[in-house]
Amino acid sequence: MNEKKVYSYEWAGRPLVIEVGQLAKQANGAVLVRYGDTSVLSTATMSKSPKPLDFFPLTVNYEERLYAAGKIPGGFIKREGRPSEKAILASRLIDRPIRPMFPDGFRNEVQVISMVMSNDSDCTSEMAAMVGSSLALAISDIPFDGPIAGVQVGYIDGEFIVNPTVEQSNQSTIHLSVAGNKDAINMVEAGALEVPEEVMLEAIMFGHEEIKKIIAFQEQIVAEVGKEKKPVTLFEIDEAIQADIKAACETDMHDAIQTAEKHARDEAIQAVKDRIIASYEEQEADDDTMKQVYTILDKMVKDEVRRQITEDKIRPDGRKLDEIRPLSSETGLLQRTHGSGLFTRGQTQALSICTLGALGDVQIIDGLGVEESKRFMHHYNFPQFSVGETGPIRGPGRREIGHGALGERALEAVIPDESVFPYTIRCVSEVLESNGSTSQASICASTLAMMDAGVPLKAPVAGIAMGLIKKGEHYSILTDIQGMEDHLGDMDFKVAGTAKGVTALQMDIKIDGLSRNILEEALTQAKVGRMHILESMLATLAEPRKQLSEFAPKIVIVKINPDKIRDVIGPGGKQINKIIEETGVKIDTEQDGTIYISSANEEMNARAKQIIEDIVREAKVGEYYLSTVKRIEKFGAFCEIFPGKDGLLHISEIQEERTKQVEDVLKLGDQLLVKVIEIDKQGRVNLSRKVVLQEEKERAEQQK
C-alpha cells in the first residue's frame, strides 16, 4: 500500500476525493480526504497488546490547524493551544458512531486522529473527518466492524439538503448531523427551529439514505486496499466462574437492584459484590481470576437490570416504562443575580443562573471560518459533590462542554432577536444532584432562569432523556432515564423542544444501530414527556417577568445617522472614552448607526444619551436656539447653539441698527436667542439675532 491510490465520488454536488498510500504510512491506517477545498488527514493506530483495563481505551481527536484557513494563531506563543469548543464537539461527534463498532472485550488502545489541513467553509470538515476516521480504521488491520459514515442535513422550504453550504445553513430550520452504518442509524446530533417530530424523523431517514451511498463508496476502497485484520486477544468471560457466582448471589442481586433509592440501591449492590469478592480473596484467587470476578459481577448487574425491564417491565426505582420522576421547580433563589431557576427531577437537580450583559459582552469566535460572535451562551458544570464523591477539580472536560453546547442549541431557537432584546445572555447550569438526564435538567432550569430574568423567550423549552433496552427483536423504550439505566442501557436519546416542536436532539447508542420504528416510537414518547414537564414548569412561572432585575443593566438605544458615528467615537476613540469615563456606561456602536448604552444606573444612561444626541444633533434652517457667546471676532461672534455645535453670528446680524464693534453689544458668556438663517455647503451655520428682534417687534405690533 505504498503506492498512492486515488478514489473519487460526487458528494452533494462537490467532489469527495480519497487518497491512500502516500501519507502517514507508519500508522495502521491513514487516508487523506479532500472534500471541495477541505482537506483532512485521518489516521488510526493501535497498541500492540491489550491494556489491563475493564473498558475499551479509544481516543478520537479532531484537530484544527489555523494554517488550514491561512491564519496565524494570536497571542505571544503563536501556536495552537488547547482545542477550541468546535474541535471538542467534533471529536465527540466522530467518537460516538465509531465506538459501538469495535468487538466486545477489545482492550487494545486505539487512537483515531483527524487533522484539518485545509478548510473550505462550504464543505464540512467534520463530515470529511468522520469519513476519514471510518476509512482509516476500515483499511487498517485494527478490528473494526465498519465502515460508518455521516452527513449533515438541512431543511429549506420543505426540502432536505445534504451537507448545506454556509449560506444554506443560515436559511435552514434544521441543523442535523446523522451517522450510522449501512443497516441503521447510530448517532444523531441536531438543532432545529421548533420543527415537528415527523419532520425530524424524515430528516434522519433522509440522511441515512445518503449514508448508505458513502458507505458503498468506502467498501469499494476497503475491498481494494484494506489490510487483513490483526488477530487480537479479546477479554472473555470464564463460564465456570460465572456459573459459580450466579449460583451464589443471583437472588440477592435481584433484590438489591429493586431498591428504589439510588444510594441505598448502590450500597445494596455493592454489599452483594463485596461478599462475593471476599470469598474469592479468601481462596487466594490469582489476578486473572479476580479480574473475571469483577467483570462478571458488573455483567450480572447489567443483565439483571435489562432482564427486569424487558421481561418484568420493572425499572430499578419501581417506575413504569413511560413514567417521569417527581418534578419540582423554583425561581428567584439568588437575590443579586439577574435571574435564577432551580429544576429538580427525582434525584437530579440543576440550578441555572442567567446573566444579562451589553452587546459588547458577546463571545468572539475566531476559528477556521470567518470571525463570528455569539450573543447567547450556555455553560454546564458538573461538580463531584453532585454524585456524593470526591475527585480532582479541573476545568470543563469534553462531557461538560458537550452538555453545555446541547443546552445552548436547545435554547438558541427561542432567544429573542437583538432588535427586540438587545442583551448578551449567559446561562450557567450548576448540577447539584445527579442521577441521570442532567443535561436536560439544565435546559429546564435555564428556561426558568431566563424567564425569571425577564428575557422574552419566544416559547419555554423543556428536555427529556429517553432510553432503550434491546434484547434480540424485543425492546423497551424508557422515559426519563436515571443514571443506572443510562449506564446499562443501549441508548441515550435526548430530546428538547417547545410545545410546538423540537429544538435539539442528541442520540448516543451502544449497539450497532436503530431502526426507523424505534426512533419514531422514542420521539413520540418523548413528546408526551416533554409536554408533561413543560406543564410543571409553567405552573411555577407562567411567563417571563415584565421587569428586569434591579441589578441587571438597563439598555438605552439611540439611532443616529451612520455618518455621525465617527463624531461619537472621536479621533482615536477620544470622544467615546470621555463619555464612558464621565458616565460609567458601556457603549456599543453598530454600522447602521444604532448605539447601545448600558449600565445599571438609568440616570447615567440618560446622561450618556443626551451627550451623544448633542454630539450628533444637526442644526436646521429656520430653527431657534438659546445660544451662548463663545468667541468674539471683528466680523462677528461665534455662538454655541447646543453642546459641540457653534454658529457664526455676523456683525450685520446682531441687531437692526448698524453695529460698529461687536464688543459694543455682546460679551463672552452672553445668552441670546438666535435663528439659523443658512447652512452653507461646508456645513457652517450662520445665525441671526436681527431676524429674531424683527419678528418680536412684528408680533408686538400685531397685538396692539
UniProtKB/Swiss-Prot annotation:
Give this protein's Gene Ontology molecular function annotations.
3'-5'-RNA exonuclease activity; magnesium ion binding; polyribonucleotide nucleotidyltransferase activity; RNA binding
Database matches in InterPro entries: ExoRNase_PH_dom1 (IPR001247), ExoRNase_PH_dom2 (IPR015847), ExoRNase_PH_dom2_sf (IPR036345), KH_dom (IPR004087), KH_dom_type_1 (IPR004088), KH_dom_type_1_sf (IPR036612), NA-bd_OB-fold (IPR012340), PNPase (IPR012162)
EC assignment = 2.7.7.8
Residues of the KH domain: 553-612
- Location of the S1 motif domain: 622-690
Q: Which GO terms describe its biological process?
A: mRNA catabolic process; RNA processing
* Transmembrane stretches, start-end: none
Q: What is the enzyme's class at the highest EC level?
A: transferase
> What Pfam families would the database entry show?
KH_1 (PF00013), PNPase (PF03726), RNase_PH (PF01138), RNase_PH_C (PF03725), S1 (PF00575)
One GO CC annotation, please?
A: cytosol
Report the subcellular localization: Cytoplasm
Binding-site residues, Mg(2+): 486, 492
Q: Which Gene3D superfamilies match?
A: GHMP Kinase, N-terminal domain, K Homology domain, type 1, Nucleic acid-binding proteins
Q: What cofactor requirement does the entry state? A: Mg(2+)
Q: What keywords does the record list, in alphabetical order?
A: Cytoplasm, Magnesium, Metal-binding, Nucleotidyltransferase, RNA-binding, Transferase
Tell me, in a sentence or two, what this protein's role is.
Involved in mRNA degradation. Catalyzes the phosphorolysis of single-stranded polyribonucleotides processively in the 3'- to 5'-direction.
Write out the similarity annotation. Answer: Belongs to the polyribonucleotide nucleotidyltransferase family.
Q: What is this protein called?
A: Polyribonucleotide nucleotidyltransferase
Query: What species is this protein from?
Result: Lysinibacillus sphaericus (strain C3-41)
- The gene name reads pnp
